[in-house]
Amino acid sequence: MSLDISQFPVLAQANTPNELRQLPQALLPQVADELREFLLKSVGISSGHFASGLGTVELTVALHYVYNTPFDRLIWDVGHQAYPHKILTGRRDKMHTIRQKDGLHPFPWREESEYDTFSVGHSGTSISAALAMAIAAEKEQAGRKVVAVIGDGAMTGGMVFEAMNHAGDLHNDMLVVLNDNEMSISENVGALNNHLAQLMSGRFYTTLREGGKKVLKGMPVIKEMAKRTEEHLKGMVVPGTLFEELGFNYIGPIDGHDVDALVETMRNMRNLKGPQVLHIMTKKGRGYEPAEKDPIGWHAVPKFDPSLFKKPATKPGLPTFSQVFGKWLCDIAEQDEKVLAITPAMREGSGMVEFSQRFPKQYFDAAIAEQHAVTLAAGFACEGFKPVVAIYSTFLQRAYDQLIHDVALQQLPVLFAIDRGGIVGADGPTHQGAFDLSFMRCIPNMVIMAPSDENECRQMLYTGYCYDAGPSAVRYPRGSATGAMQVEAMTALPIGKGVIKRVGKRIAILNFGTLLASALTAAESLDATVVDMRFVKPLDVDLVKEMAQTHEVLVTVEENAIMGGAGAGVLEQLQKLRMPKAVLQIGLPDEFIKHGSPEEVTHDLQLDAEGILAQINAYLAQ
């Protein structure tokens, strides 16, 4: 259900940036107010990322007003904050479909709009992409401008500083907008600082500054004195020294909710030479009191009624796998103070809130710095501690070298609790946990476990905790557990051993992970044997051999890419044993999995019970 645009009379006149730029500047505050109200009601209908977008309304209006998008390139980092951008770039009438099957993509996506100049989803990529586009713009000589928008949270990633260091060295024309959305507006944001930013970005100041540099080039002592004087004057009101040292001209901070100040400052900065940083201060959840008070809790929301000023109550139900992990972590920390938990800015999502509160000295949030988080764990292991890295499958990709070089190569006992393994759903291809089994399986010294239910997950986490011969990983999906009876006592499982769950004939289904219930349902119609393999690596070779000897067809089932996954490991072992056998591999196809609800995606990929049965029957009919 789309919103009635007649309720937003000024916004109705700005369905595209070209239309926005036709409006008088005096109307921009009203555009921003109506855009915020539209976003509020739209996300209430569709669900989605919420607080970040409310904080970037004025910024988005100013950017599209000053810059000639899409000719000028605008790159958003991550994209959580880009909903207002989508609304202003011709997608207003489809906002109610965002994150839904066949609807708008959850993040800026090149295939969706010419205004989305770079597809995003993971943090820290915007400045590298913007630098490349700035270099290309200089080669084209067409007058194209390039802007990257990045949040303060993403500034903790090493890739950001690698890009800024390179940009400062090359000195191409580009603007980086640092959206600093801390919980409150900084004290030095206000009329004085806005005026200072406009003054320092103005033509007179910059001409004087650049001309002075040329004059002082032959007088190094006076040049150094002038430089220090300028830095001292700026340093009294601005925290830009770091960016200046990296080769950027720094302007700000200014109030990111003052659309007129943003427009005037950007107009001044638009034609400045070299790399520029505009530091703006915004408030997550701006304009909606519950989100302002709890921006983390309102980061992403289900469908809700904004007029109630609260999210819908969650229905009591099964715990999530993240909660199962969080409880296990607290239980084990009660027994062992050497357990140290590390997460790259995923405390809430990984189920670690209680642990962080109860065991603050054993909890480390490495921020959005996955490479650092993994090597930090390696260092802890060297010193005799028991590090546990809680990380999403899609983000572990970003620390692959550290996993190999710093952990596995040294056979360090680091436990990886890999959340969001398999189909994640609405966040789409940038967040599906499709590849972890494949990219870990080829690493020597790794033990990889895939639990079929919450009790097995708990026991596998304990198994990894006890395993000291090298790194281990337990990967589990997003969402609710299966309802299995949890055994509070923790027992280490025998490494590399699976269990037979159902005895049948002719067909043996070798299941890896939480698709076990669907495999068992499909097996009833086929009278097939079902095995809970438990371990992807080391594989239970004896059990695979037994199944191959006693069945005509083997079927492997996993919620991971078929290429290089657990099923590929079964085929490799059969070849090694010189046992030719008909094997059907069921899993994720060789494509990036689109967004939709987990249930929709699972059904479309034929990974539910009905689909597994259909795939097996089709294979048998060949």
UniProtKB/Swiss-Prot annotation:
Sites where the protein binds thiamine diphosphate: 80, 121-123, 153-154, 181, 288, 370
Family note: Belongs to the transketolase family. DXPS subfamily.
One Pfam assignment: DXP_synthase_N
Reaction it catalyzes: D-glyceraldehyde 3-phosphate + pyruvate + H(+) = 1-deoxy-D-xylulose 5-phosphate + CO2
Taxonomic source organism: Shewanella baltica (strain OS195)
Protein name (database record): 1-deoxy-D-xylulose-5-phosphate synthase
Gene3D superfamilies associated with the record: 3.40.50.920, 3.40.50.970
UniProt cross-references to InterPro entries, sorted A to Z: Dxylulose-5-P_synthase (IPR005477), THDP-binding (IPR029061), Transketo_C/PFOR_II (IPR009014), Transketolase-like_Pyr-bd (IPR005475), Transketolase_BS (IPR020826), Transketolase_C (IPR033248), Transketolase_CS (IPR049557)
Domain of life, per lineage: Bacteria
Binding annotation for Mg(2+): 152, 181
One of the GO biological process terms: thiamine biosynthetic process
Alphabetically ordered keywords of this record: Isoprene biosynthesis, Magnesium, Metal-binding, Thiamine biosynthesis, Thiamine pyrophosphate, Transferase
Alphabetized PANTHER family for the sequence: 1-D-DEOXYXYLULOSE 5-PHOSPHATE SYNTHASE-RELATED (PTHR43322), 1-DEOXY-D-XYLULOSE-5-PHOSPHATE SYNTHASE, CHLOROPLASTIC (PTHR43322:SF5)
Any one cellular-component term (Gene Ontology): cytosol
Function in brief: Catalyzes the acyloin condensation reaction between C atoms 2 and 3 of pyruvate and glyceraldehyde 3-phosphate to yield 1-deoxy-D-xylulose-5-phosphate (DXP).
Signal peptide location: none
EC number(s) from the headed UniProt entry: 2.2.1.7
Coiled coil: none
An example Gene Ontology molecular-function term: thiamine pyrophosphate binding
PROSITE patterns in UniProt: TRANSKETOLASE_1, TRANSKETOLASE_2
Pathway(s) of this molecule: Metabolic intermediate biosynthesis; 1-deoxy-D-xylulose 5-phosphate biosynthesis; 1-deoxy-D-xylulose 5-phosphate from D-glyceraldehyde 3-phosphate and pyruvate: step 1/1
Subunit structure: Homodimer.
Cofactor(s), names only, from the UniProt record: Mg(2+); thiamine diphosphate
Cofactor details (free text): Binds 1 Mg(2+) ion per subunit.
